[in-house]
Amino acid sequence: WKEDIMSNIYVFPRGIQRAGYNKENAVKWTSKYGSVIATGYDIGTCDGMNEKGLVASLLFLPESVFDRQGDTRPVMGISIWTQYVLDNFATVHEAVEELKKESFRIDAPHMPNGSASTLHLAITDETGNTAVLEYLDGNLSIHEGKEFQVMTNSPRYDYQLAINDYWKEIGGLQMLPGTNRSSDRFVRASFYIHAIPQTPDAKIAVPSVLSVMRNVSVPFGITTPDKPHISSTRWRSVSDQKNKIYYFESVMTPNLFWLDLKKIDFSPKAGIKKLPLTNGKIYAGDAVKDLKDSDSFVFLFQTPVM
């Protein structure tokens, strides 16, 4: 991202009553599952894992188009879309079966810095099943399957797959595209994710995946005025869905830390917890002990709260 998105980590318990919008005609639900999430600007959920091992990650996609002319369906704010998935579903297939009904429309206000909220969502579960969800011309496009292991940014996913097929023919051991463009990073990640050790041992798997993520990250502080959609990587997360551990690494701190979901009380009585990241505090190892009682952040919707 082109600036610090002021991320913090929150723990949400089960039983929270939510609405997808702050006026009438909103999607409403009560969270079935607790989750550990990372925010963007503290106005929305952009990444996280729930207690069932479902992971959801929201990334920039400038080609996104959410609007349909004359659309009167109930409203889901893009700021809370990721949280809706984490709150309600245990598996990718379960989520896809509901989301493909397209029973709501996405409300996508501009972000605090004025950027458009053009985003797409990836979800994975502990079986390895994955879905990439993109709104194109007002309609939801879904790619579901274990073969979809990488998502970056532009272009739209079907175009990414076509570009990757071209590079598969060349072969990654001979040459890989090396720029910071998201399509090149997609190709490199697609090659390396199959080249690293394929093991259930988290002590090997987690650092192996992190090594791929570091390889395809955009260096901190890079500026490309002629390519405004290329921006620095701000942080990386890895979700160990088998052992229910959420790892987090900020480019501004020297340490990897994690939250072991098995040690967290997600019952409704436990309340909301927060791990502040914007105050310069450095964490290392299991940071469950550093969680503090907290109010929730306020999700951003198109209509300001009066």
Report the location of each language-model feature.
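Structural recognition of the beta-strand scaffold that forms the well-ordered cores
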Residues: 55-58, 122-124, 132, 238
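C-terminus-biased signal that marks the final domain/tail of proteins
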Residues: 107-109, 116-117, 126, 149-306
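A contiguous strand-loop segment
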Residues: 1-73, 106, 284-285, 290
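Proteins synthesized as precursors that undergo proteolytic processing into mature forms
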Residues: 72-109, 202-211, 216
